């Protein structure tokens, strides 16, 4: 299945400034889904939660547990909104391309935003930048910069390289898992459309892979949030 992303090249007349319309559209859809879901889940709150309120409270406690596993709650509670936003956004982004793919005139429109390395690396870069921001804000510039030459100044180049490797691994791990899943799903869809025998031959593997992809999508959203809090704790906690 040879499909390309709908890309607008050289926007505003700037060479190399390209815009992937599929990523833009799917990111907007994912954000809209997350926003509507969270508003729906937080309306008419009751002392005895039921239905979607139960799930929302479980999600809050789940993310809170991730934070407390990496830093004390007094320091980490300000990261609860960040963790919730990330886990919902990444989960929906991972799963939205599982059900189907949308192709219009050989352009791939409907897909998981996290199946694009540009999107995941941009997200990981933003997260690493946030860790530096909160490290300076909560510890002070002088104390924060000292961490790069601790315990000895020789550690400075290694810690600089570590920042780049953390950014790459955080983004590429998410991209690789979701992209591989969508590629295999696309191959199965292609097999199913070749003939009636191909349809029955691919139907069961396709259903099994879609189920497995839901599991992978959930695991990867957890891993991303967990690593975010690990990196954050390294910057804001004095015991790291």
UniProtKB/Swiss-Prot annotation:
Keywords: ATP synthesis, Cell membrane, CF(0), Hydrogen ion transport, Ion transport, Membrane, Transmembrane, Transmembrane helix, Transport
Cellular location(s): Cell membrane
Any one GO BP annotation for this protein: proton motive force-driven plasma membrane ATP synthesis
GO MF, one example: proton-transporting ATP synthase activity, rotational mechanism
A Pfam family recorded for this sequence: ATP-synt_A
Membrane topology: Multi-pass membrane protein
PROSITE patterns: ATPASE_A
GO cellular component terms, semicolon-separated: plasma membrane; proton-transporting ATP synthase complex
Membrane spanning residue stretches: 21-41, 78-98, 116-136, 183-203, 212-232
Keyword Protein biosynthesis set for record: no
Chief location of this protein within or outside the cell: membrane
Superkingdom in the source lineage: Bacteria
Function description: Key component of the proton channel; it plays a direct role in the translocation of protons across the membrane.
Subunit details: F-type ATPases have 2 components, CF(1) - the catalytic core - and CF(0) - the membrane proton channel. CF(1) has five subunits: alpha(3), beta(3), gamma(1), delta(1), epsilon(1). CF(0) has three main subunits: a(1), b(2) and c(9-12). The alpha and beta chains form an alternating ring which encloses part of the gamma chain. CF(1) is attached to CF(0) by a central stalk formed by the gamma and epsilon chains, while a peripheral stalk is formed by the delta and b chains.
Similarity section: Belongs to the ATPase A chain family.
Protein name: ATP synthase subunit a
Record organism: Oceanobacillus iheyensis (strain DSM 14371 / CIP 107618 / JCM 11309 / KCTC 3954 / HTE831)
Gene label: atpB
């Amino acid at each position: 299945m040879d499909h390309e992303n709908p890309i607008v090249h050289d926007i505003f007349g700037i060479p190399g400034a390209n815009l992937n319309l599929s990523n833009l559209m799917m990111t907007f859809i994912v954000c809209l889904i997350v926003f509507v879901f969270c508003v729906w889940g937080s309306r008419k709150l009751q002392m005895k939660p039921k239905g979607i309120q139960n799930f929302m409270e479980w999600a809050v406690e789940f993310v809170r547990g991730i934070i407390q596993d990496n830093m004390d709650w007094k320091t980490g509670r300000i990261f609860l909104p960040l963790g919730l936003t990330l886990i919902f956004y990444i989960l929906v982004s991972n799963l939205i391309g599982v059900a189907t793919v949308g192709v219009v005139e050989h352009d791939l429109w409907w897909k998981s935003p996290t199946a694009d390395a540009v999107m995941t690396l941009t997200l990981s870069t933003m997260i690493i930048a946030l860790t530096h921001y909160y490290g300076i804000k909560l510890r002070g510039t002088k104390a924060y910069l000292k961490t790069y030459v601790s315990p000895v100044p020789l550690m400075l180049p290694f810690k600089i390289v570590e920042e780049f490797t953390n950014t790459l691994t955080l983004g590429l791990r998410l991209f690789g898992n979701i992209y591989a899943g969508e590629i295999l799903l696309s191959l199965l869809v292609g097999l199913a459309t070749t003939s009636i025998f191909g349809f029955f031959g691919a139907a069961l593997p396709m259903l099994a892979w879609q189920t497995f992809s839901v599991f992978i999508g959930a695991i990867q959203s957890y891993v991303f949030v967990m690593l975010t809090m690990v990196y954050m704790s390294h910057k804001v906690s004095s015991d790291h």
